[in-house]
Regions:
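Glycine-centered, phosphate/nucleic-acid-interacting loop/turn motifs that mediate DNA/RNA or nucleotide
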Residues: 22-24, 85, 145
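Feature responds to low-complexity, polar/acidic, surface-exposed segments characteristic
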Residues: 1-12, 25-76, 88-104, 112-135, ...
Length: 177
């Protein structure tokens, strides 16, 4: 449905899946563009995961972060993410919703949303230390086809996660992992 997503790509299948899912995981940035190369914020990624989970009821759930307004579009998603161990924020009192979500953060949020399954594989990327907070998440994602590196030997954990990357990760995680 978007002019900037070629029909003969995996991205097209992922965007179509996210756009037509119920509840709808994401929409375009305009009626005709998806902006797959645009970066995602932490609020956007958590919101996509919350929608993928079916937007469960979070009424009565406390919002522990001072930087998330109760009426923010992502407030329920953040409540859900905290209550389900998907995130603990960037500190005890902040979530940093408008910060760009890195590839390491995105894959960790997906991994936690999947229940942080046991990982038997080791990380095969030179830029992912075995003791990095995201090492198990990267190993799980690579082993299950959720995401690959930015090259055969690098994952680029500190790079910004794009809209195209997160939608493909969600699609693969939901249909393959």
């Amino acid at each position: 449905p978007f002019t900037d997503v070629p029909a003969d790509t995996e991205l097209y299948a992922a965007v179509k899946w996210a756009y037509f899912s119920a509840p709808q995981i994401t929409v375009g940035v305009t009626e005709t563009t998806f902006a797959p190369a645009s970066t995602c914020t932490r609020a956007e990624v958590v919101t996509f995961l919350y929608r993928l989970a079916g937007e469960p009821d979070v009424s009565g759930t406390a919002l522990p972060f001072t930087d998330v307004a109760a009426d923010a579009y992502y407030a329920d998603a953040v409540k859900w993410a905290v209550a389900n161990g998907v995130t603990s924020g960037t500190s005890a009192t902040t979530f940093s919703p408008n910060d760009t979500c890195t590839r390491a953060q995105a894959v960790t949020l997906l991994y936690n949303a999947a229940g942080a399954p046991a990982v038997s594989d080791t990380v095969s990327f030179a830029d992912v230390a075995a003791d990095a907070y995201y090492a198990n998440a990267v190993a799980w994602a690579a082993a299950n086809g959720v995401t690959a590196g930015t090259s055969a030997t690098t994952f680029s954990p500190d790079d910004a996660c794009t809209r195209g990357q997160i939608v493909c990760m969600l699609y693969r995680g939901d249909t393959q992992a």
